[in-house]
Amino acid sequence: MSGLSGPLSWPGPLLSALLFLFLLGPSSVLGISFHLPVNSRKCLREEIHKDLLVTGAYEITDQSGGAGGLRTHLKITDSAGHILYAKEDATKGKFAFTTEDYDMFEVCFESKGTGRIPDQLVILDMKHGVEAKNYEEIAKVEKLKPLEVELRRLEDLSESIVNDFAYMKKREEEMRDTNESTNTRVLYFSIFSMFCLIGLATWQVFYLRRFFKAKKLIE
């Protein structure tokens, strides 16, 4: 039996696609950290599409040593004020939810305590869509090979990009319709204003004519 010799050959387009995923992967992870003073509230807002899985992990570093009864509350809401996740006295944890509509979502951290307490360090990592999927778990459940997992990621990423372009096209059409409707209203208002000015000018001419006749300035 002859053994394999030389490096493993990869198809050019497939290798390019996998390289694209490798380069895109790290940049698609969104993480943020900030300092939260005592008795203050800070919120982060993000627009997210419909029917997307959103996952996140947070960690709050308490540098007060438990002084002042310091407590930090975490709450995630949509634009209508519906609570999607809430945690009292949050320190470290994870959350997940699925969006029902395209909306603006708000993640708020609120610190409460007494006395002079050092600022807390809040670390938040949020992912949604393709980034939020656990492909390792999918590979275990569906018994996929590493290459098949990367192809699944590529398929999901392509679908996400197509959906984003479709949404942008829809928004463009809506904005164009709004612009055309606004232009039509402006045109009608301009015509109405012109007739009003013509009517006012005509009325002034007749009024002045009667006035001058009454004063016998003209015949």
From Swiss-Prot:
Residues 32-185 are lumenal. Residues 41-193 form the GOLD domain. The modification Dimethylated arginine is found at residues 171, 176. Residues 1-142 are annotated as: Required for interaction with STX17. Cargo receptor involved in protein vesicular trafficking and quality control in the endoplasmic reticulum (ER) and Golgi. The p24 protein family is a group of transmembrane proteins that bind coat protein complex I/COPI and coat protein complex II/COPII involved in vesicular trafficking between the membranes. Acts at the lumenal side for incorporation of secretory cargo molecules into transport vesicles and involved in vesicle coat formation at the cytoplasmic side. Belongs to the EMP24/GP25L family. This is Transmembrane emp24 domain-containing protein 10.
